[in-house]
C-alpha cells in the first residue's frame, strides 16, 4: 500500500475541488494512483469533482506563427513562471515557432539543428537553448510542436502564453478566429461527436456505470428498490451522449453567443473547420510536488548520521 502524503492529497484537491477527506479516501482506495483517484472522485461526487481537473501545474509557454498557408505552433517548458516572462526565453520561443512553420522539422532534434542565433549564442537553435540555460540558470526544453500546411487557411489564437490554438479552415477569416478563441475557452476534443476517440468514450462510460453502481448501493442501503437494469443502461448511455455533446466542437454553444451552436454559427458564416490543434502548457505533465515534512526528516536524519 502506497503512503498517502499531505502533498498528494493537496494536489488531488487542487485538481478536483473535492473535500480533503474524500481526496484522501480516493487516494487510499487507488493505492496512490492520482489518475485512478480522480476517476473514483468523479464516480462518487459526479461533475463536482471535475471542475478543476483541467488545471495544469507545469510551467512554460505556447506560441504560434503563421506565414500565409504555412504555420507552426510549439510548447516550450521551463522550471518556474519567472522564466516565462524573460525576454530572451520568449524570443527563442517565437523564433522556434517560426522555424517550425518555415522548415517543417521531423522531430525535436531536427528542430534544434536548424540555424538560429540569439544573445550571442548559436549557430543552431539547440545552441541558443543551451546558452540560455547557462545564462538564466534554469532548464528549458522544446516539448512538442506541429507544422501546418495544405489543409486550408490558418487562424491562430494565443490566450496569454499558456494556451495556443491553430485552426485549419475554409471561409471567413473573422469567424475562424472566433472559433480559435472558442476552442481555447471550451477545449473540445474533436470537431464532431463521431470523431471523439474511443478510449475517451469508454472512460466516460465507465464513470457513468460506476456512478450508477454507487446509486444502486445507496438505494439498497436506504431500503429502496434499485432502478431496473434497462433504466440504468439508458442513464449510462445518456451520460455518454451528454459528454459527446460537451466535448465536440460543432455541438458546443458558441462562446460569443450561446443561443447558437458553433456549427450553426459556422453555417451562417459559410465557413468550415477542417481541423484544429489545442496546446495547453504542461498538459499531461505531472509537476513534482515536494513532501516537505519528509524532506526535513531526511535532512535531520542525515545531520545526525554525520555528527
Swiss-Prot record:
Renumbered residue ranges of the record's region Involved in Mg(2+) ion dislocation from EF-Tu: 80-83
GO MF term set: translation elongation factor activity
Gene3D superfamilies assigned: 1.10.286.20, DNA helicase RuvA subunit, C-terminal domain (1.10.8.10), Elongation factor Ts, dimerisation domain (3.30.479.20)
Alphabetized InterPro entries for the sequence: EF-Ts_dimer_sf, Transl_elong_EFTs/EF1B, Transl_elong_EFTs/EF1B_dimer, Transl_elong_Ts_CS, UBA-like_sf
Coiled coil: none
Subcellular location: Cytoplasm
One cellular-component annotation, GO: cytoplasm
Highest taxon, organism lineage: Bacteria
Organism: Variovorax paradoxus (strain S110)
CDD domains in the cross-refs: UBA_EF-Ts
Keywords, ordered alphabetically: Cytoplasm, Elongation factor, Protein biosynthesis
Disulfide partners: none
Gene for this chain: tsf
Pfam families: EF_TS
Protein name: Elongation factor Ts
Entry function: Associates with the EF-Tu.GDP complex and induces the exchange of GDP to GTP. It remains bound to the aminoacyl-tRNA.EF-Tu.GTP complex up to the GTP hydrolysis stage on the ribosome.
Cytoplasm as UniProt keyword: yes
Membership in a protein family: Belongs to the EF-Ts family.
Keyword Protein biosynthesis carried by entry: yes
Amino acid at each position: 500500500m502506497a503512503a498517502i502524503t499531505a502533498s498528494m492529497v493537496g494536489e488531488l484537491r487542487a485538481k478536483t475541488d473535492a473535500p480533503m477527506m474524500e481526496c484522501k479516501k480516493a487516494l487510499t482506495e487507488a493505492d496512490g494512483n492520482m489518475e485512478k483517484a480522480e476517476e473514483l472522485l468523479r464516480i462518487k461526487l459526479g461533475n463536482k469533482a471535475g471542475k478543476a481537473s483541467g488545471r495544469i501545474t507545469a510551467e512554460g509557454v505556447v506560441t504560434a506563427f503563421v506565414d500565409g498557408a504555412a504555420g507552426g505552433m510549439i510548447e516550450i517548458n521551463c522550471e518556474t513562471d519567472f522564466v516565462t516572462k524573460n525576454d530572451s526565453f520568449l524570443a527563442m520561443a517565437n523564433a522556434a515557432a517560426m522555424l517550425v512553420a518555415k522548415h517543417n522539422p521531423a522531430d525535436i532534434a531536427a528542430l534544434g539543428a536548424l540555424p538560429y542565433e540569439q544573445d550571442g549564442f548559436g549557430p543552431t537553435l539547440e545552441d541558443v537553448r543551451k546558452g540560455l540555460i547557462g545564462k538564466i540558470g534554469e532548464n528549458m526544453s522544446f516539448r512538442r510542436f506541429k507544422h501546418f500546411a495544405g489543409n486550408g487557411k490558418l487562424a491562430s489564437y494565443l490566450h496569454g502564453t499558456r494556451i495556443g490554438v491553430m485552426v485549419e479552415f475554409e471561409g471567413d477569416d473573422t469567424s475562424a478566429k472566433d472559433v480559435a478563441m472558442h476552442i481555447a475557452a471550451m477545449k473540445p476534443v474533436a470537431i464532431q461527436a463521431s470523431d471523439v476517440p474511443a478510449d475517451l468514450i469508454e472512460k466516460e462510460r465507465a464513470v457513468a456505470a460506476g456512478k450508477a453502481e454507487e446509486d444502486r448501493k445507496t438505494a439498497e442501503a436506504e431500503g429502496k428498490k434499485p432502478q431496473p437494469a434497462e433504466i440504468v443502461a439508458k442513464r449510462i448511455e445518456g451520460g455518454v451522449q451528454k459528454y459527446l455533446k460537451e466535448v465536440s466542437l460543432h455541438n458546443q454553444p458558441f462562446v460569443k453567443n450561446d443561443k447558437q451552436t458553433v456549427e450553426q454559427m459556422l453555417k451562417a458564416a459559410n465557413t468550415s473547420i477542417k481541423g484544429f490543434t489545442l496546446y495547453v502548457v504542461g498538459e499531461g505533465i505531472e509537476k513534482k510536488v515536494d513532501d516537505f515534512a519528509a524532506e526535513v526528516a531526511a535532512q535531520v536524519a542525515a545531520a545526525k548520521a554525520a555528527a
